[in-house]
């Protein structure tokens, strides 16, 4: 699995093409393929101090210069205030992503391959250099740009204050703002040269400028590292950086970290090789040989992280800023864990959310601060039933059923019981068996934008996808109670009532599709109705299902996602850019969402027949996603896209449910029926 990109010395058109790596703890690394930083949330080591939250930028990047004779080649790419930038991109011959990052530079007679990798399960970044010199002796000057800030904030000279401890082959930094941790950086050789100017400031992140915020950062640079490159030599050089509790830096610990690297200058390369082996193992476990499925499998892994508070794994909703959201986790769950053969992760994720079930609700989100979870969602608990159903469908062993019966089934029964009686956020079952949710300022469906007292998409009443999920949950419970010998036909009886009421209340003869919300009937054409066709248990006849899919195709499908609103609607806002207020107006009012492709493709295949011809058509519908993997975040899928052409990727540059749902629908509904796998 490899992406190779030629940049052609074009900084402006490549600055928004980004990359990301993750460490399985919620920590990550990221940058632009130009070598510059494009967002506040980027750097070579953004560590999670309390997995998977409390994320801090510790190591922003490295800049390099080659000095040969009287000539200096500046390989750095940085954008500064006002949009001016250094021109290191002219020396980049290729950018490569294969589970690690590699920039290939050519300057004069010297070729440098600069590899970046993260260790799994540690807050540790490795930068490994392969240097080939076909000419005269030269020097490689490396400037580490250090930092310490919460990953959504920016640094200034005043905020970047450290106690600096120099070692022979490295240094440690103790942040004065949080002196219970220290940052260690070590080099496999070279000479540390103290810099006169210890700060590089006014570093500008273009995406933040697009969003009408300053986007300026500052980095602390106490030393350069000078490495001799003999004439005609080939050599390796390593940098390792981590952040550890302060006690790990006491005494000679920081020096020992540096000495370890010096004694074995392959340490960074060992991390690099370990990450490549890890990526190969992910692919092997998935069983995929199809190129698209393989690439999505590698992307899927980036969202799975350990949660320290539960001791189990969870799913981060999106890179670079989201934490674990219940709704996003349950929607992405099948693609991220089951399609990829990671059944133990699937097991742990179900346990994580069962542990936090409260008043019939599973968490909407876990805040980045690590505080108590928030429960303001009606659909996360209902998507949980879908995840359980899929877990049993894929794993299908006696142990799997026993696990669900013992650890999950009580939670499921509590959810059904509580929804029937009523719970927080005006969530309750009405006399017609349908679920009502939301009131006032509460936003409890996925269309949840609220700014102060302004609610963009209130959707109070009985939303269409909530009641499709409710019916699916009741049918799932009926299946489970029969399997577990409960002899309880109440779920089946209630499901029958829901089916009758749903068909009576939601079908809109005027539009030939479903209302988005009843009882205050909202005939706005939105994508939520697709789940009334795509879920395992559904309520509509074939003619109505086909009409829904045709309407969604005609009005909402845009290649990499479905529009959140009919473009003919007066409130349609297709472009997600500018200030927060401008973006909030577009978020669910025209912006297209990648995750919705999953339900749409499944519904499309269902209504058109599971044939080779249908699979080929569905496969073609996914071609824009294949192209997208080479843009925005290389190898992954954005959270959202502009509703109007050219449908630029926006929001999180890598989103769990976008990746998970595209992978799920592809491996369930398309790939099995293709005449041959893509190579």
Model regions and ranges:
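Terminal accessory carbohydrate-recognition/targeting modules of carbohydrate-active enzymes
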Residues: 1-288, 320, 327, 338, ...
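Catalytic cores of carbohydrate-active enzymes
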Residues: 363-364, 417-420, 427-430, 471-576, ...
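Active-site-adjacent "gating/activation" loops or surface patches in catalytic cores
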Residues: 297-315
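Short helix-capping and inter-helix turn/linker motifs at the boundaries of alpha-helical repeat units
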Residues: 119, 291, 309-310, 323-327, ...
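Non-catalytic C-terminal accessory modules of carbohydrate-active enzymes
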Residues: 73-100, 107-111, 421, 550-558, ...
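Extended, well-ordered alpha-helical scaffold segments
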Residues: 252-288, 292-299, 341-355, 399-421, ...
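Carbohydrate-binding/catalytic loop surfaces
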Residues: 310-324, 363-383, 387, 391, ...
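Aromatic-rich carbohydrate-recognition surfaces in CAZymes
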Residues: 133, 155-157, 229, 323-329, ...
């Amino acid at each position: 699995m490899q992406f190779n990109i030629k940049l052609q010395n074009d900084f402006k058109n490549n600055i928004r093409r980004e990359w990301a790596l993750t460490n399985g703890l919620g920590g990550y690394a990221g940058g632009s393929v130009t070598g510059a930083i494009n967002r506040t949330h980027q750097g070579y080591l953004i560590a999670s101090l309390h997995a998977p939250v409390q994320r801090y930028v510790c190591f922003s990047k490295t800049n390099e210069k080659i000095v040969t004779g009287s000539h200096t080649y500046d390989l750095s790419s940085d954008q500064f205030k006002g949009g001016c930038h250094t021109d290191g991109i002219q020396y980049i011959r290729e950018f490569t992503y294969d589970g690690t990052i590699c920039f290939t530079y050519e300057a004069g007679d010297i070729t440098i391959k600069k590899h970046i990798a993260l260790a799994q399960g540690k807050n540790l970044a490795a930068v490994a250099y392969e240097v080939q010199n076909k000419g005269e002796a030269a020097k490689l000057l490396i400037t580490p740009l250090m930092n310490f800030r919460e990953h959504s904030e920016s640094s200034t000279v005043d905020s970047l204050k450290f106690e600096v401890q120099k070692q022979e082959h490295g240094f440690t930094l103790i942040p004065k703002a949080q002196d219970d941790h220290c940052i260690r950086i070590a080099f496999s050789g070279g000479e540390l040269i103290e810099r006169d100017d210890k700060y590089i400031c006014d570093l500008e992140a273009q995406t933040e400028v697009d969003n009408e915020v300053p986007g300026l950062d500052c980095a602390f640079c106490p030393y350069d590292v000078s490495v001799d490159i003999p004439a005609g030599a080939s050599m390796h050089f390593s940098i390792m950086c981590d952040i550890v509790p302060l006690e790990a830096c006491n005494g000679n610990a920081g020096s020992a970290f540096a000495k370890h690297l010096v004694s074995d200058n392959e340490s960074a390369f060992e991390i690099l090789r370990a990450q490549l082996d890890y990526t190969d193992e992910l692919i092997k476990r998935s069983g995929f040989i199809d190129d698209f499925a393989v690439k999505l499998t590698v992307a899927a892994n980036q969202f799975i992280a350990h949660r320290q508070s539960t001791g189990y794994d969870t799913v981060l909703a999106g890179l670079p800023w989201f934490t674990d959201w219940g709704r996003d986790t349950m929607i992405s769950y099948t693609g991220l864990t089951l399609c990829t053969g990671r059944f133990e992760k699937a097991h742990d994720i179900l346990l994580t959310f069962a542990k936090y079930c409260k008043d019939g609700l599973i968490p909407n989100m876990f805040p980045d601060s690590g505080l108590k979870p928030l429960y303001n969602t009606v659909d996360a608990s209902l998507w949980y039933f879908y995840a359980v159903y899929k877990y049993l469908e894929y794993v299908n062993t006696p142990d799997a059923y026993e696990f669900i019966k013992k650890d999950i089934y009580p939670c499921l029964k509590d959810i059904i019981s509580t929804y029937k009686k009523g719970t927080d956020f005006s969530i309750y079952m009405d006399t017609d068996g349908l679920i009502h949710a939301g009131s006032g300022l509460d936003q409890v469906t996925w269309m949840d934008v609220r700014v102060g007292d302004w609610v963009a998409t209130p959707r109070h009443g009985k939303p269409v996808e909530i009641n499709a999920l409710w019916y699916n949950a009741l049918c799932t419970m009926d299946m489970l109670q029969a399997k577990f010998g409960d002899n309880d036909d109440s779920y089946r009886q209630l499901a029958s009532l829901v089916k009758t009421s749903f068909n009576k209340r939601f079908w809109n003869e005027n539009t030939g599709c479903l209302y988005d919300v009843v009882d205050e009937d909202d005939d706005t054409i939105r994508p939520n109705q697709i789940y009334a066709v795509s879920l395992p248990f559904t309520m509509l006849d074939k003619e109505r299902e086909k009409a829904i899919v045709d309407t969604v195709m005609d009005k909402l499908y845009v290649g990499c996602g479905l529009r959140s609103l009919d473009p003919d609607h007066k409130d349609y806002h297709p472009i997600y850019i500018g200030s927060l207020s401008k973006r909030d107006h577009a978020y669910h009012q025209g912006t297209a969402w990648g995750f919705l492709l999953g339900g749409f493709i499944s519904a499309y295949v269902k209504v058109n027949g599971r044939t080779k011809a249908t699979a080929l058509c569905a496969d073609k519908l996914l071609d824009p996603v294949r192209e997208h993997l080479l843009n925005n975040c290389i190898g992954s899928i954005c959270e959202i896209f502009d509703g109007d052409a050219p449908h630029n990727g926006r929001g999180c540059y890598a989103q769990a449910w976008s990746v998970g749902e595209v992978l799920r629908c592809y491996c369930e509904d398309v790939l099995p029926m293709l005449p041959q796998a893509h190579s």
